[in-house]
Amino acid sequence: MKRTTFFQLICTALLLTGLSSCGWRREDIGPFQGDQQTFELANFDRLDMGSAFTITVQPGSAFRILAEGDRRNLDDLDVYTRNGTLYARYRNSRNRQYETSFTITMPTLRGVSFSGASQSSIAGFTNLNELDIELSGASKGQFAVQAKQTNLTLSGASNLQLSGLGAALGADLSGASTLQAFAYPVNDANLDLSGASKANISVSSSLDIDASGASNVRYRGAPSVKQRLSGSSSVQTD
C-alpha cells in the first residue's frame, strides 16, 4: 500500500514538472476583484473582439469604451484601433473564472467580427447603408438594426437573432450555425448553408438558396425561390 502511494506521488510530481516545462498556466482564481476600465479611443466604425467577452454596442454621438470585470483580466486586455477598427483581446491565453464585459458607444456601425464564444447585443443603429456581421467559435448575438444591405457569416455553431428592417440579406452559415431572422424582413435574400446549419428568414421578393449537409431553411413571405439542395437539406415555408 505504501509502495503504491509513493509511486502515485512520484507520478504526480513528474506530471506537474512536465506541465511547468511546457509553459502550462492555470488561473489563480482567488476572490473576485471587481473593477472597471475605460479606453480613450475614437474614430472607428468596426469591431473585432474575441476571448469570450460579453459585448453591448449602442449608438451615441461620442465614442466610449467601458470594460468591467475582474481586475486581473482587465490588466491583461489589449485594446487598440487600426484602420477604423477597434480590436480587443487578452494578451495571454489561459482559463478565466470571471467574465469581462464591454459596453461600447459609437456614432455609427459598419461591421463586427466576434469570436471565441462571445455573447453580444447590438441595438439602436438605423439607416445603415451596409452592415457586415461575422460570428465564429460558438458565439451568440442579438442584434436589432436597420440596414439596406446586411452581410452575415456565421460559423462554428454560432447563433444570431436578428430583428429590425433590411432591404437585402446575404448569409453564409456553416458548422451547425443558426440564423433566426423572422423579425428582420427583407426584399431579397441569398443564402449559403452547410454543415447542418439552419436559417429562419422573412423575404418578400426573391430568395436564392444553396444548402448542403442536412441544412434547413424556413421562410415567411411569397418570394420567388431558387434552390440548390444536397445532403438531405430542406427548404420549407413557415
Show where each model-derived region lies.
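Extended, compositionally simple hydrophobic/Ser/Thr-rich segments
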Residues: D45-V57, F102-I104, L109-D238
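Short, ordered coil/turn segments that flank beta-strands lining enzyme active or ligand-binding pockets
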Residues: R82
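Short acidic/polar N-terminal linker immediately downstream of export determinants
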Residues: K2-T12, S20-L74, T85-T105, S121, ...
